[in-house]
Amino acid sequence: MMARLWKTTWFLLAILVALVAFSYQVKRKTFIRVEEVNALESSVKETLEYVTEEYNKKSEDLYNFRILRILKIEKQMTNHMEFHITVEMQRTTCLKTEKNLCNVQEGELHKQIQCYFSVYVIPWLEVFKMLKKNCTNSS
């Protein structure tokens, strides 16, 4: 009788350990795929607009910046979608209060930066969240 009780206890303990291990594995990100994508993809366009707007909102510069060149865009699929974007941006002639498409600054006010953005995206709900931003001077 006692041996049977021990076997049952060990069996239940083994099931508990397996369930804990399984639930931990489910919580971890599982990479489905990472691929380089084209800037013309609709969710990429929206994401580029979002990162530009977010950069300009949080920047202490008096002028808006705009994307001059896209260097790389990767889409990472896990339990959600992330874009990893590397771009060159330049300071424009528009102050932050202006929302027009403006020329880039020339001369003394010229400033060019290279930025890496990691963005959480749910395109069909138009949800964007900046996960990481790193910008450095490039001129």
Curated annotation (Swiss-Prot):
Keywords attached to this entry: Disulfide bond, Glycoprotein, Protease inhibitor, Secreted, Signal, Thiol protease inhibitor
Family recorded in the similarity comment: Belongs to the cystatin family.
One of the record's GO molecular function terms: cysteine-type endopeptidase inhibitor activity
Record-given protein name: Cystatin-11
Gene Ontology BP annotations: androgen receptor signaling pathway; defense response to Gram-negative bacterium; killing of cells of another organism
Subcellular location: Secreted
Keyword Signal tagged: yes
Disulphide connectivity of cysteines: C94-C102, C115-C135
Glycosylation site positions: N134
Annotated Gene Ontology cellular component terms: cytoplasm; extracellular region; nucleus; sperm flagellum; sperm head
